[in-house]
Each structure stands twice: as C-alpha cells, then as structure tokens.
C-alpha cells in the first residue's frame, strides 16, 4: 500500500483538511467523510473549551486525528505558547507551526518560523512548519528535525492555484534531502491538487476551496480523487515532453507520406 509517514504516524490519505470556514459542524463532518481524511487541522484558539462559537468542535472531529495549529501567532514566542496549549488541550504531540505577522498577504515569517521550530523540537514536538517555497529554509528546517515542510502554492485562501510551481519543482528534485513535503495554501481546484501530486510531492492541505464550495462534501470527494489521480500518475512515470510532434500511429506502410503520395501510387 502506498502510505506515507509524519514522524512515527503512518497515513494512507494524502489529503489533509482544515476545519475552518464551514457553514456548520455537520457540513464539516460530511466533507471530512467524503475526503476520507485521516488528519484535520484545527486552530488552538478554536479548541479552547470556552471559545465563543466553537463549542462542540472537538466532538464534531471525533474519529479523525487532530493537528493543532498555531494560527494567529505573529512571533516565535506566541507560536510556542499556542503549541503548548494545543498539546495540553488535544493530547497531540504534533503541531502545524504558523507564524504570520503580515495581516494583508498572510505570508509566513521565515526567521520566526525557524526560531519557533527549534524551540518546539527541543520540547519534543513533532513540527510541521508552514513556510514560503524557499528550498534553503526547508533544508534548514529539515536539519533541525521537523516532521515535514509545508511550502505554499499561493497565498492562504486565494484559490490561485500552483503559482509557485517552479519553486515546488525544486522541492521535488531535492526530496531525498527533505522530510515529507506537504503543499499548503492557495489550492482552489482539484486540478491544482493533482498538479502538485504529479510532481511527486507527498500530500496537500486544503481548507477554503472545500469549505467555501457550494457543495463542500462533493468538492471534498473531488479533491480526494484528484490527489489519488495525481499520485498514481506520478508513480506511473509520466512521459517526457517533446519539442516536436510525434505521431501516435506508425507511418510506415501507408500509401501516402506527410509530403504527398508515394511515387507510383497516385490516383489510378
């Protein structure tokens, strides 16, 4: 079976879901089921039992593995505090590390992310850091011992698709020196997820594209199928693009050549 690992955790599904932006918990549960997701990210701030509007979230997520995230953290210090709280509330050792000081474009801070990752690893967390598509930073995080790296495809919630493809191709080339690569943020269509998986990267994380669809469960199923198709295409070994056309049927033995009738075989 084609499984993958995040630290010691073995997973079958390569589609991770976010839990935000759904109309209600019932729709969220239907989407999770349609995606056959094993892991769902959840903001530590939403897990707090007295958080307004979020009562019942943990109950709604029963049966899946929770991945607490540090959404809302603007500095390494804030991220570490949220990660500790997430471990206390969920009992999970792993954490999706997000350090985002920029409220306009929601781009992650590479220096604070690196600093927070180092501290959390020292505290025995399994760290899954959200980051820009920076291969040098990815290798620095890998050297610290992060469980994954999570480069963005486009800004969070934009739905722009794989705008960073050229840089993600570098991640695919360097996979042997990296932990699992999970592409996170900006995917708007199932075809975007398939494109990422065709590169040979390990998984994708999707939230807004599913939660804001007119039919979230149907879109979740579409993303699941796209991830599976992209992964199978990668494993099948795609053909290499050519610089010129190549006929799919042999031309030898036909009465005409591409430049006209063969000698002696014109109209009778």
From Swiss-Prot:
Recorded coiled-coil stretches: none
Pfam family, one: ThiG
Reaction catalyzed: [ThiS sulfur-carrier protein]-C-terminal-Gly-aminoethanethioate + 2-iminoacetate + 1-deoxy-D-xylulose 5-phosphate = [ThiS sulfur-carrier protein]-C-terminal Gly-Gly + 2-[(2R,5Z)-2-carboxy-4-methylthiazol-5(2H)-ylidene]ethyl phosphate + 2 H2O + H(+)
Keywords for the protein's UniProt record, in alphabetical order: Cytoplasm, Schiff base, Thiamine biosynthesis, Transferase
EC number: 2.8.1.10
Active-site feature positions: 96 (schiff-base intermediate with dxp)
CDD domains to which the protein is assigned, alphabetical: ThiG
Sequence ranges of Pro residues compositional bias: 258-268
Region (Disordered): 238-268
UniProt subunit comment: Homotetramer. Forms heterodimers with either ThiH or ThiS.
Family indicated by similarity: Belongs to the ThiG family.
Name the record gives this protein: Thiazole synthase
Organism: Thermus thermophilus (strain ATCC 27634 / DSM 579 / HB8)
Name of encoding gene: thiG
């Amino acid at each position: 079976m084609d499984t993958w690992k995040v630290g010691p955790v073995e997973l079958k599904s390569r589609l991770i879901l976010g839990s935000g932006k759904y109309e209600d918990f019932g729709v969220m549960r239907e989407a999770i089921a349609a995606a056959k997701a094993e892991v769902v990210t959840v903001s530590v701030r939403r897990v707090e039992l007295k958080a307004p509007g979020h009562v019942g979230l943990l109950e709604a997520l029963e049966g899946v593995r929770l991945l607490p995230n540090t959404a809302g953290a603007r500095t390494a210090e804030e991220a570490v505090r949220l990660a500790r709280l997430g471990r206390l509330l969920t009992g999970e050792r792993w954490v999706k590390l997000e350090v985002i000081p920029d409220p306009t474009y929601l781009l992650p801070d590479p220096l604070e992310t690196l600093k927070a990752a180092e501290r959390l690893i020292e505290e025995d967390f399994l760290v899954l850091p959200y980051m820009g598509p920076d291969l040098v930073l990815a290798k620095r995080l890998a050297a610290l011992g992060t469980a994954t790296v999570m480069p963005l495809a486009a800004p969070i919630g934009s739905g722009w698709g794989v705008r960073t493809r050229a840089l993600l191709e570098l991640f695919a080339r360097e996979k042997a020196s990296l932990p699992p690569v999970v592409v996170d943020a900006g995917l708007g269509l199932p075809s975007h997820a398939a494109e990422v998986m065709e590169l040979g990267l390990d998984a994708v994380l999707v939230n807004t594209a599913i939660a804001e669809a007119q039919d979230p469960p149907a879109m979740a199923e579409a993303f699941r199928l796209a991830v599976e198709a992209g992964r199978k295409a990668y494993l099948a070994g795609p053909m290499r693009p050519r610089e010129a056309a190549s006929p799919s049927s042999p031309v030898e033995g036909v009465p005409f050549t591409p430049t006209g009738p063969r000698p002696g075989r014109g109209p009778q």
